[in-house]
Amino acid sequence: GQRGETAEADFLITSGMLVPTGVFDRVGPFDEGLFIDSTDREWCFRARSMGYRLFFVARASLAHELGDRPVRLFGRVLRGWAHHSPQRLYYMMRNRVLLYRRNYVPLGWKCHDAIRAAGKFFAFSVLIGPRLANGRWMLMGLWDGRRGKTGPFAN
């Protein structure tokens, strides 16, 4: 779209999100139990379930890093993929499982994301190092998500 045009979105990232305080009062705060990952996505799903619509400004720019560095596989940069620490992968896996359990999260997103999660698990535990640590932390995240664990990781 043209610079400045708006379009509707399913969810937005917290960085650069502008929300009227009245909406925040009605929808509630971000879920701090999710700690690092998916707090924005969860809030957006909750807002949409209450009838709010989300919009983004086309071609707006915001300097923001979503990972340590781009992922390269067989010499090619994978667009939309970034290296993350094994601990960050833990939160990504745990929190997506926590979202799967919430009834206001759209079923279509859950199905699509489960496929994405399987691809991410395979890629980071088989192809992208540190493979063993990545796999271990992601398995712990899946397990803790299934158990309903929230907040920062604790041994």
Where are these regions (language model features)?
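A recurrent flexible, glycine/aromatic-enriched loop bordering the glycosyltransferase active site
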Residues: Q2-G22, H84
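A short, conserved alpha-helix in the catalytic core of glycosyltransferases
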Residues: M17, V23-G28, G33-A63
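Short glycine/serine- and small hydrophobic-enriched flexible loop segments
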Residues: R46-M50, L98-R101, F124
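Active-site donor/metal-binding and catalytic loop motifs
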Residues: V57-G80
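A short acidic, glycine-rich active-site loop
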Residues: V77-Y90
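A conserved mid-domain beta-alpha-beta active-site/ligand-binding segment of alpha/beta enzyme cores
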Residues: M92-V97
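Non-catalytic, C-terminal membrane-associated alpha-helical segments of glycosyltransferases
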Residues: R101-N155
